Amino acid sequence: MEEVIVTQDRSSIGIIPMHKKTLIALGLKKKGQSKKHKMTPQLKGMLRQVGYLLKVEKV
């Protein structure tokens, strides 16, 4: 299964509360924080929802 590194590129101040919960589910709380995830259908949906706040790199 493919792995990706997800980095929060923009601040979560002033965004929709549901998007903030999605960031927390991804393990991201602060700007510049990164986490490694396995690419799953659930993760793809989360990345599509809050992609405007993130930078995604394939490993």
Curated annotation (Swiss-Prot):
It comes from Leptospira biflexa serovar Patoc (strain Patoc 1 / ATCC 23582 / Paris). The gene is rpmD. Coiled coil: none annotated. Pfam families: Ribosomal_L30 (PF00327). Transmembrane segments: none annotated. One of its GO terms (cellular component) is large ribosomal subunit. The keyword Endoplasmic reticulum does not apply. One of its GO terms (molecular function) is structural constituent of ribosome. Keywords: Ribonucleoprotein, Ribosomal protein. Part of the 50S ribosomal subunit. This is Large ribosomal subunit protein uL30. Belongs to the universal ribosomal protein uL30 family. GO terms for biological process: translation.
